Amino acid sequence: MPTEGDVLADGQSIVGRSGYVGYMLQKDLLLPYKKIIDNVSLPLLLSGKSKKEARTEAGSHFAQFGLEGTQQQYPAELSGGMRQRAALLRTYLAGDRVALLDEPFSALDTITKSAMHRWYLSVMEEIKLSTIFITHDIDEAVLLSDRILILSGRPGKITHQITIAEPKPRRRDFNLTPEFLDYKKQVIDALGVVL
């Protein structure tokens, strides 16, 4: 619970209310003994839906999240990128207004991470889910964000705010443009990093 201020979604306070924010840690934390359909439908079960209702609702999003054909598989049978997609779907089903993502792509190799970034941007544009994205990767922050908030050390306070004024969906080569490098430099300067 916040010690001061308020948290608003659509102009209404959501402090102490569940179902608005889905949270995803760095690791996918899929349950290894449950099939993918049962892993992603878990938030719906916890919200009171029957197993059948939860599976049906979760299953209706599999194509959108690029998970076709994985419903009956176990997490160990999927690649890292596919497990992250399943975890993101579970997060989306847990909170339908805001997703809080804590470095969801940090464990992925460069090629998979790049593919996931492009996929993530297209899906978030489609489902219109607001996202608070935590990352230590400056390129990732510039590529995925509308706004970058830079925090101080503990206790964390916002020290800088940088608006990324590039339209979405972002151009495929955005990270190779002078504009991208300018945003990246702004972040580096705000962090006080000397290169």
Language-model features, listed with the residues they occupy:
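A short, proline-enriched helix->beta-strand linker immediately N-terminal to the Walker B motif
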Residues: 93-97
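Conserved H-loop
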Residues: 128-134
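Conserved ABC ATPase signature
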Residues: 74-78, 82
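Conserved ABC transporter NBD signature motif
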Residues: 2-17, 57
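Catalytic Walker B motif of ABC-type/P-loop ATPase nucleotide-binding domains
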Residues: 99-102
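Conserved ABC ATPase "signature" region
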Residues: 45, 52-70
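Short coil-to-helix segment of the ABC ATPase nucleotide-binding domain corresponding to the Q-loop/switch region
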Residues: 34-41
